[in-house]
């Protein structure tokens, strides 16, 4: 009996010890960082979902399942073995998983799948492959479900293969200087591709970019025995830019015409759209100064200009990001997005350019037009109508009446079914890492079915304390939102070294009502090391309206620094923040902000780590740089004020600068020029370059990067 009691006591002690050990488990960067060996195991559980018409399909590795939208029950639709058997797969056609399965035809049992060598279309009721296309060696692959024709780039030339596989070569002069069928204008203005199929699949609009006149930036590949010269075309602010034209290829006539848009010099063509009848092409045309934007229509057969439908000007800039979208139930009307009233909203036009109605309005932003509900004649949108940090889903009818489609605060993303009657609502909240609901929006009141509630994948680890709040901007009026990450055993009576993490630039914000208030995993790692991390979204960041973003116009970094210093003032009021041990870190625009803060407020920040930093905007690219700063010729004071070269002499604290050796976004000239200025000024920054890496470190190099950043603060801030 005594022996049994002893064993029981030992078992209890072991269980308690194991529980404590599990609760005390520490993160490593292999756990937290993208590219880490254990990163995938600490992600919230997910389901990969897609629509087959109005039927919901779960695409998994080994099988695709049909999901009952009310109960969530799963029925096998087909398996991976089925697909490879029906397709009589060889090495080229062999499908390795079903995660990327898509169902392009709402009323047909056809699934499209692919690998790096081929794309196939399989009839899973007839159990046979009905179409295939070899894609080995191809880039910019674009498939039309209507004609089953494909567009692609091979050896710099643009090709189209029709639905029967007949190959048509559209270009012969393609090169690194003459680029066909790929994204242009350095992916600005919402551009992410270079080919655009007409709705009937019989015509292909495509970009042709002549960048022969653009200066080469001298990148070097150091990995061969003899390092090789691999230049990038990089148009810097105020310098000669490329010229873009838009071609249209007709499958029936096998002829190409070009839109008669006039001289493309110093102009941007973006947001290409088709009319529902495939006869007309629409695009936004923007001047180089980016303050005069026009929506223009063209005859898709002749290339002739039809009409200028809309014009928007600004004393700062206009930034078109979205193509127009025609109403599925009325081909004579389209919806356009614009910030012309101060916030991004939807406007209804007729096809001749007459504005019929502003469909959404108010001091909030339409973040995405998700799609259309044809039965209710409504538009499904994502917007921050309730609060700047919450991204919610709404339905908007043609009268401008808005109805909310879900009931939970947080950050929502939607996938809409073919008819628009159902949507997959995947959302997160500060305390819920992933939830997936199915919403039936065909009723007067939306009906919701619950599909997934992911458990906390970090359970059992030492988790920090995540907080969110707001302070006033430097203007004394505007609310700015912050996130603070504290050690898990935070003691308000102690003082903690604190790091300000900053981005601060356009088209990004760091604080949202998502899991952990959108905290980056590195912040958790730093809190585990005993730091507080503070993140503030200053004026200039996204989703707060036009005036909030454009407050930084022609003076990047200045208003942003004023707001960040308001954050520092707030930190100074907190007794647990050690103001003698304050650091700052950021990447890209955040790297620019880091060095700006270190050199404009040298007595405030003790340590900084700046990654991929812009040093002088005259070395940045034309499209982004000139939108916010103008050119060095028309805004010399702004360029001089924001340049960090003249501020190298102000550096007092420890500063580490990190760059990808082959960065083609913020080219190494920035970092190297600042180092040269520091040499001349007698200041001593540290420098580290990642060979072969571009603007962001990929794969496991990212783990190394974040260990280096962390160690720098460990060495000099504590």
Residue ranges and their predicted role:
Residues 1-25:
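Bacterial Sec-dependent N-terminal signal peptides
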Residues 8, 14, 36-39, 84-87, ...:
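A broad, structure-centric signal for solvent-exposed, well-ordered loop/edge residues
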Residues 13, 40, 149, 237-239, ...:
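Sterically constrained small-residue positions within well-ordered secondary structures
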Residues 14, 211, 288, 506, ...:
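Short, glycine/serine-rich, charged loops/turns that create anion-binding
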Residues 22-405, 409-410, 421-422, 432:
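Beta-propeller folds
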Residues 216, 273, 278, 413-718:
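Serine-hydrolase catalytic core recognition
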């Amino acid at each position: 009996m005594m022996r049994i009691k002893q064993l029981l006591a030992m078992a209890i002690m072991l269980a308690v010890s194991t529980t404590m050990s599990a609760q005390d488990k520490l993160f490593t960067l292999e756990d937290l960082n993208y590219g880490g060996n254990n990163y995938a195991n600490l992600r919230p559980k997910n389901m990969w979902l897609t629509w087959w018409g109005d039927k919901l399909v779960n695409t998994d590795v080994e099988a695709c399942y049909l999901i009952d939208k009310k109960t969530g029950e799963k029925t096998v639709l087909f398996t991976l073995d089925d697909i490879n058997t029906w397709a009589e797969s060889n090495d080229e056609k062999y499908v390795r998983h079903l995660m990327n399965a898509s169902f392009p035809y709402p009323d047909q049992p056809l699934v499209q799948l692919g690998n790096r060598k081929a794309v196939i279309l399989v009839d899973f009721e007839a159990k046979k492959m009905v179409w295939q296309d070899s894609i080995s060696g191809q880039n910019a692959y674009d498939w039309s479900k209507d004609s089953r024709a494909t567009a692609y780039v091979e050896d710099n030339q643009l090709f189209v293969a029709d639905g029967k596989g007949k190959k048509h070569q559209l270009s012969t002069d393609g090169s690194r200087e003459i680029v066909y069928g790929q994204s242009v204008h350095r992916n600005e203005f919402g551009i992410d591709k270079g080919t655009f199929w007409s709705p009937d699949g019989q015509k292909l609009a495509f970009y042709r970019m002549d960048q022969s006149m653009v200066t080469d930036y001298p990148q070097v590949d150091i990995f061969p025995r003899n390092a090789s010269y691999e230049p990038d075309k990089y148009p810097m602010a105020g310098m000669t830019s490329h010229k873009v034209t838009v071609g249209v290829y007709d499958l029936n006539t096998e002829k190409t015409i070009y839109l008669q848009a006039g001289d493309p010099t110093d102009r941007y063509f973006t947001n290409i759209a088709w009319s529902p009848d495939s006869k007309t092409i629409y695009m936004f045309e923007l001047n180089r100064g980016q303050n005069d934007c026009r929506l223009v229509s063209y005859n898709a057969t002749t290339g002739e200009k039809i009409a200028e439908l809309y014009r928007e000007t600004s004393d700062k800039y206009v930034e078109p990001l979205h193509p127009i979208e025609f109403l599925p139930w009325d081909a004579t009307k389209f919806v356009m997005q614009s910030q012309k009233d101060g916030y991004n909203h939807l406007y209804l036009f007729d096809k001749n350019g007459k504005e019929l109605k502003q469909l959404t309005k108010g001091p909030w932003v339409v973040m995405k037009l998700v799609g259309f509900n044809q039965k209710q004649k409504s538009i499904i949108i994502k917007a921050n109508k309730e609060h700047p940090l919450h991204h919610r889903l709404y339905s908007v009818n043609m009268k401008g009446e808005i109805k909310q489609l879900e009931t939970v605060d947080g950050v929502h993303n939607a996938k809409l079914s073919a008819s628009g009657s159902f949507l997959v609502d995947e959302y997160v909240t500060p305390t819920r890492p992933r939830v997936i609901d199915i919403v039936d929006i065909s009723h007067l009141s939306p009906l919701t079915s619950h599909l997934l509630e992911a458990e906390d994948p970090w359970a059992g680890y030492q988790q920090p304390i995540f907080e969110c709040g707001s302070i006033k901007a430097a203007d004394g009026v505007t609310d700015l939102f912050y996130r603070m990450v504290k050690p898990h055993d935070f003691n308000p009576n102690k003082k903690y070294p604190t790091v300000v993490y900053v981005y601060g630039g356009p088209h990004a914000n760091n604080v949202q009502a998502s899991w952990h208030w959108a905290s980056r995993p590195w912040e958790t790692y730093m809190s585990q090391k005993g730091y507080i991390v503070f993140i503030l979204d200053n004026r200039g960041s996204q989703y707060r309206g036009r005036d909030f973003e454009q407050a930084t116009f022609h003076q990047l970094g200045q208003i942003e620094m004023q707001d960040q210093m308001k954050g520092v003032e707030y930190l100074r009021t907190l007794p647990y923040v050690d103001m003698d041990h304050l650091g700052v870190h950021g990447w890209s625009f955040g790297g620019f902000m880091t060095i700006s803060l270190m050199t404009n407020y040298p007595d405030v920040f003790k340590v900084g780590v700046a990654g991929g930093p812009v040093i002088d905007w005259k070395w940045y690219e034309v499209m982004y740089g000139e939108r916010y700063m103008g050119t060095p010729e028309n805004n010399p004071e702004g360029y001089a004020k924001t340049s960090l070269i003249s501020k190298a002499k102000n550096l007092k604290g420890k500063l580490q600068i990190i760059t990808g050796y082959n960065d083609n976004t913020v080219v190494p000239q920035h970092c190297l020029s600042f180092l040269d200025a520091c040499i001349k000024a007698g200041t001593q920054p540290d420098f580290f370059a990642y060979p072969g890496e571009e603007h962001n470190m990929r794969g496991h190099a990212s783990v190394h990067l974040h260990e280096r950043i962390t160690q720098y603060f460990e060495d000099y801030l504590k």
